[in-house]
Amino acid sequence: MPNTINTNFVPWFRSVAPYIHLHRGKTFVVGIAGEAIAAGKLQHLAQDLALIQSMGVKVVLVHGFRPQVNEQLLAKGHTPRYSHGMRITDEVALDCAQEAAGQLRYEIEAAFSQGLPNTPMAGSTIRVMSGNFITARPVGIVDGVDFQHSGLVRKVDTAGIMQTLNFGAMVLLSPFGFSPTGEAFNLTMEEVATSVAIALQADKLIFMSEIPGIRMQPNEPESEDNPIDTELPLAVAEKLLANLPSPTQPSDAAFYLQHCVKACKEGVERSHILPFDVDGSLLLEIYMHDGIGTMVVDEKLESLREATADDVSGILQLIEPFEKDGTLVKRSPTEIERDANNYSIIEHDGVIFACAALYPYPEARTAEMAALTVSPHVQGQGDGERVLKRIEQRAKAAGLDSIFVLTTRTMHWFLKRGFKQVDPDWLPDARKRKYNWDRKSQVLVKKVS
């Protein structure tokens, strides 16, 4: 059993390493719905947030308190009142909000202070700091409704928050703001988190919500044919949002989506809607290729491009397992660095998941495609075909008639994509001299002109 565990753990941990490097030093604003805390999810969320901070991420945590305030209002015999999806905060509601905020901040700080041995928080030294970082203004009267002590964010103390983050602390914000005259306003977690993310130009805005994400057809019921859309380019998200009814409660598809769109339009690279009821969803989204929930991004994260010298380490990491098992011929770092411009790569969120190299033989009007590799984590998603097509385009643009590959294990994959098997004697003289007759690679050719 220990050997099996170790065997599974090592490749998984290696696959996570690129994301650890990618996110180190980045700033994430995380909004946790009050419903998550009411559902008893705070302890696990605190552990996950402590973990990502220990790996170098700067975290701003904004908590909600909608159900907690409602519970206190009902206990006092008052019915919670809303309009346009926003609470109408009278004097009683303001008192309840202040009391709920104080209690939740106490619980959150306590969760980050636990460090018992043999627990996920063992040895952690998480400093949680709060402050009057939000200046607010009143909502006022909208469509004849006086929102009283409900407010909107007027200004974010960016310098103060960054100073606290650079000190190594996690910033904790309640959905409260104060006017220049000292008047308190009840805000929403979603608006505070979005405003802070925009002001900081954070790398990520993340909502831990009660919904699993945005479905491809939001108005249709859950089904196998209507799964969660894991990645929404900003333009698609805007179009989708325009066709959704105005949200009145957190379970509405547009409730979080509107804030994600706003953040991405104003400089936040990526915004996420994650389900808090899935244990570890925050870690799955940040440190896995496919993630969980829905991400709104201002451009398609996955890019197909030619490699540069900066990509050498990523290419080496991708092809190394295939060199070890004999699928690929071993190449030295020096060779790959020298030939970096020959490679085409698929990069997703800063990590290389597929590559191939093109080595022309102009005198024979052909070129070798070498080191075609797709990460096991994304195989079966068409990345191999995309890289192959790019190599074909590059060969055609160079005025060549064909491309060829040498393979010992993947002949049928190439045959299905238009390659024909030929004798090794077909190879250009310069390549034939380097042919390894002991390896006995199959030679396959495809016309591109």
List PLM regions with ranges.
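Conserved catalytic-core motifs of GNAT/GCN5-like acyltransferases
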Residues: F404-L406, L415, K420-V443
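Short amphipathic alpha-helix that is part of the acyltransferase structural core
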Residues: D229-E231, E299-K330, K440-V443
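Conserved acetyl-CoA-binding loop-helix of GNAT-fold acetyltransferases
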Residues: V374, G380-A397, V405
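Nucleotide/pyrophosphate-binding catalytic subdomain
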Residues: M1-R270, A309-G314, E347, P360
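A conserved beta-strand-loop-helix scaffold within acyl/acetyltransferase catalytic domains
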Residues: K330-V374
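Terminal amphipathic helices with adjacent charged low-complexity linkers/tails
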Residues: R66-V69, V278-L282, D290
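Conserved N-terminal entry element of GNAT/NAT acetyltransferase domains
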Residues: Y287-A309, S449
